[in-house]
């Protein structure tokens, strides 16, 4: 809602029309910036959506929602990613009894990995404590947002993960994309592509058995469009072949294999 907390009620009204359960995650634009301290910084959010930290169980997976935006009144920026002592007590109590063989999905707003080289964006000590609590679990999916880009992080020793299970963080793109910026179309809607070229839209998590699948859906493009291709539209015959073809695969990981071929030719790695 971009700091306009009066829109919370309208968001609920629109979401209700979709007739599906919603688990709301608080973000930095949901803060009461006139609050005197962190403890009271989500009073408006809680009044509309309920608790900011809770667990939700399904037969396929267990879900935990965390408010990881620590409000720092008077500072710039006025928040940092992290967790509070009360949240750690909740996590310790809940995770002790949760089924360790089921997928555990943790949703928060600020990414658990560091997004800036200039400063700490998520408190490292809090991440270390959280990851210690997650060690007994076989499969953990972290869902984060905030960056208005998309990325996948496989946590390991470099990011304080020392468990035997898989710890995958998906930093999801935004419905508003690049803050509703860019050239407007005939209907007046901005291009809204994010910094990494991903179009605005939404992600879908599908859980089946012991595995899950993540897909990105463009808000206004073909529903199955998984990438954008960038190549010259016209090539002069006999010209020096100094051109490039770029593929922006919206849900790619660092180890994703992307190949290209021309007509019925051989596939070549990109």
Could you describe each region identified by the protein language model?
Residues 245, 256-261:
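Beta-strand-rich binding/interaction modules
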Residues 26, 102-118:
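Active-site segments of SGNH/GDSL-like serine hydrolases
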Residues 68, 107-111, 146-147, 217-219:
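Short, well-ordered beta-to-alpha junction loops that form the rim of enzyme active sites
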């Amino acid at each position: 809602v971009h700091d306009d907390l009066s829109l919370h009620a309208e968001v609920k009204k629109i979401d209700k029309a979709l007739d599906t359960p919603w688990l709301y995650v608080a973000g930095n634009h949901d803060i009461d910036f006139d609050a005197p301290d962190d403890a009271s910084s989500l009073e408006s959010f809680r009044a509309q959506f309920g608790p900011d930290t809770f667990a939700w169980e399904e037969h396929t997976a267990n879900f935990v929602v965390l408010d990881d935006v620590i409000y720092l009144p008077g500072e710039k920026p006025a928040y940092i990613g992290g967790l509070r002592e009360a949240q750690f007590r909740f996590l310790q109590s809940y995770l002790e009894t949760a089924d360790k063989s089921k997928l555990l999905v943790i949703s928060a707003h600020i990414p658990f990995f560091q997004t800036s080289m200039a400063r700490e964006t998520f408190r490292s000590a809090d991440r270390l404590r959280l990851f210690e609590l997650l060690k007994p679990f076989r499969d953990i999916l972290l869902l984060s947002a905030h960056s208005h880009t998309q990325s996948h992080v496989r946590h390991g020793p470099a990011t304080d993960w020392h468990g035997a299970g898989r710890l995958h963080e998906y930093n999801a793109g935004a419905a508003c994309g690049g803050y509703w910026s860019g050239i407007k179309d005939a209907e007046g809607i901005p291009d809204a592509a994010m910094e990494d070229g991903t179009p605005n839209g939404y992600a879908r998590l599908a859980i089946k058995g012991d595995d899950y699948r993540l897909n990105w859906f463009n808000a206004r493009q073909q529903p199955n469009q998984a990438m954008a291709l960038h190549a010259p539209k016209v090539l002069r015959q006999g010209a020096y072949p100094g051109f490039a073809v770029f593929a922006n695969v919206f849900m790619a990981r660092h180890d994703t294999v992307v190949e290209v071929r021309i007509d019925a030719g051989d596939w070549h790695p990109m």
